[in-house]
C-alpha cells in the first residue's frame, strides 16, 4: 500500500466517523488540539497523520484506532 492509498482510506474513515459523531473540522480541531488546517489536510488526503494524532482523534471520536486505520483486506 502506498501513501496515496493510505491517505484515501484514512480520510474516508475519518470523514465517516466525524459525520457519525456530529463533528465538523473546527470542532475536531478544538477537541484534539490539531490545527484546523491539518484536519483539512487529512480530509483532503494531503497529510498523513502521526500516530499521536490518530490516537487523539480516536479518543475524541470515542472509537477504536482500528476504525480510523481499518484497511480491510488491502494490506499485502
At which residue positions do the language-model features occur?
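Residue-level signal for the short linker/turn that defines the boundary of a DNA-recognition helix
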Residues: 23, 49-52
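A short, Lys/Arg-rich alpha-helix, primarily the initiator
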Residues: 1-23
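The alpha-helix within a helix-turn-helix
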Residues: 18, 29, 58
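DNA major-groove recognition helix of helix-turn-helix/homeodomain DNA-binding modules
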Residues: 52-67
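DNA major-groove recognition helix of helix-turn-helix
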Residues: 43, 61, 69-72
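Residue-level detection of the helix-turn-helix DNA-binding "recognition helix"
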Residues: 19, 33, 44, 73
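Short alpha-helical DNA-recognition segment
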Residues: 22-41
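Residues within the helices of the helix-turn-helix
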Residues: 15, 26, 55
